[in-house]
């Protein structure tokens, strides 16, 4: 049996991949993708941000202060930022504007979870911490 996320052969029994997939995943994808994704969805009202890395890993990250700075967003996606489709309510999706031009690796995880055709890392950021409001 193959992992529904990374497509590698599953050793042992496997894990329930929901909500990251509709079948079984390997232990590595369970730890690096499924559990963090469940935590993100469970804490949607909080300020968790998902960094979808091209190594098939979902990392929960936070800004250094209350809001993300442009520099932090650029560091997360390794370059100029671009906002793309909203994949979760009240979240913005930040990607590298030049990911394809710079020949970054296709982000299989962003495609698998959200149907995003992204090259390089993707960041799923709650709107409320995306940038500092002018009146704050």
Q: Where in the sequence are the language-model features?
A:
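Short metal-binding segments enriched for Cys and/or His
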Residues: 28-43
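Short Cys/His-rich Zn2+-coordinating modules
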Residues: 5-14
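Short cysteine-rich clusters marking metal-coordination/redox-active sites
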Residues: 3-6, 26-29
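Short beta-rich binding modules
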Residues: 39, 43-136
């Amino acid at each position: 049996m193959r992992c529904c996320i990374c497509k590698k052969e599953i050793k042992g029994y496997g894990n329930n991949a929901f909500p990251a997939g509709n079948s079984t995943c390997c232990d590595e994808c369970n730890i690096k993708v499924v559990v963090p994704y469940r935590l993100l969805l469970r804490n949607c009202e909080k300020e968790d941000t998902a960094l979808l890395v091209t190594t098939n890993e979902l990392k929960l990250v936070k800004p250094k202060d209350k809001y993300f700075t442009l520099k932090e967003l650029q560091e997360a996606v390794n370059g100029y930022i671009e906002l793309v489709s909203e994949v979760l309510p009240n979240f913005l999706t930040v990607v590298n504007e030049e990911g394809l031009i710079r020949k970054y690796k296709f982000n299989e995880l962003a495609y698998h979870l959200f149907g995003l055709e992204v090259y390089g890392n993707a960041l799923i950021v709650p709107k409320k911490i995306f940038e500092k409001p002018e009146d704050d």
